[in-house]
Design a protein with these regions (language model features):
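Thiamine diphosphate
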Residues: 30-101
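N-terminal glycine-rich anion-binding loops that anchor highly charged ligand groups
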Residues: 6-38, 58
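Mobile, glycine- and charge-enriched loop segments
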Residues: 1-5
Length: 101
């Protein structure tokens, strides 16, 4: 295995990819924007910018319920906007891994 120098967000994106990520939906904002920008470079991962944090969370939760490993990225304050689908997922559960950053 070869070594590669990565910045933190590039390393997160690489880890998600190597962990089997299939869907990434994010709302842009520092410091998490670079994660999705890096994920978008992988052809076999569907990635999108959502219109808001709630939609990004809904896409990630829905993908995970359908069995695809997913990622949802946003600023920390955006979690307030995404709270409804996050709380719903906590009691409905998911069927595949889901990362929120």
């Amino acid at each position: 295995m070869s070594k590669k120098l990565l910045i933190g967000n590039e390393a997160v994106a690489r880890g998600l990819y190597e962990g089997g990520l299939r869907v990434a939906s994010s709302y842009p904002g520092t410091p998490s924007t670079e994660i999705t920008e890096c994920i978008a470079k992988y052809d076999d991962v569907y990635s999108e910018w959502a219109p808001n944090e709630k939609v990004a969370m809904e896409v990630a939760v829905g993908s995970s319920i359908a069995g695809a490993r997913s990622f949802c990225g946003m600023k920390h304050v955006g979690l307030n906007v995404a709270a409804d689908p996050l709380f719903t997922a906590s009691y409905t559960g998911v069927n595949a891994g889901m990362v929120i950053a």
